[in-house]
Swiss-Prot record:
Keyword Ribonucleoprotein: yes
Protein name according to UniProt: Large ribosomal subunit protein eL32
The encoding gene: RpL32
Gene Ontology CC terms, in alphabetical order: cytosolic large ribosomal subunit
Family: Belongs to the eukaryotic ribosomal protein eL32 family.
Organism listed in the record: Drosophila subobscura
CDD domains registered for this protein in UniProt: Ribosomal_L32_L32e
């Protein structure tokens, strides 16, 4: 039986397009990552019509759906079995994600314990080798 989230609203993003850096399309040396324009005559900083938009607090997501995955859960990074037990009472709100540095031996233990505690994992199959018949 799969665990379903306690609350699963429709996740609405106010803006899905990336904010790009001013004149990054003009010069190859400028990356597209956002940098706030600081110049005294800058059109973007002065918010002229037709220029790139600047990120501000108004583009933030709804507080209830912020950091929520499409499944309706929020992520919690797990490094060992003990950290998994923190999610015991919150298993309908948070799901575990096994950290990158965890070995495959410990991953098996975490996946096993998560099944017992009925905690959902985002990456239960990560770095688990299947037995090959020789």
């Amino acid at each position: 039986m799969t665990i379903r989230p306690a609350y699963r609203p429709k996740i609405i993003k106010k803006r899905t397009k990336h904010f790009i850096r001013h004149q990054s399309d003009r010069y190859a040396k400028l990356s597209h990552k956002w940098r706030k324009p600081k110049g005294i005559d800058n059109r973007v900083r002065r918010r002229f019509k037709g220029q790139y938009l600047m990120p501000n607090i108004g583009y933030g997501s709804n507080k209830r759906t912020r950091h929520m995955l499409p499944t309706g859960f929020k992520k919690f990074l797990v490094h060992n079995v003990r950290e998994l037990e923190v999610l015991l009472m919150q298993n309908r709100i948070y799901c575990g994600e096994i950290a990158h540095a965890v070995s495959s031996k410990k991953r098996k233990e975490i996946v096993e314990r998560a099944k017992q505690l009925s905690i959902r994992l985002t990456n239960p199959n990560g770095r688990l080798r299947s037995q090959e018949n020789e």
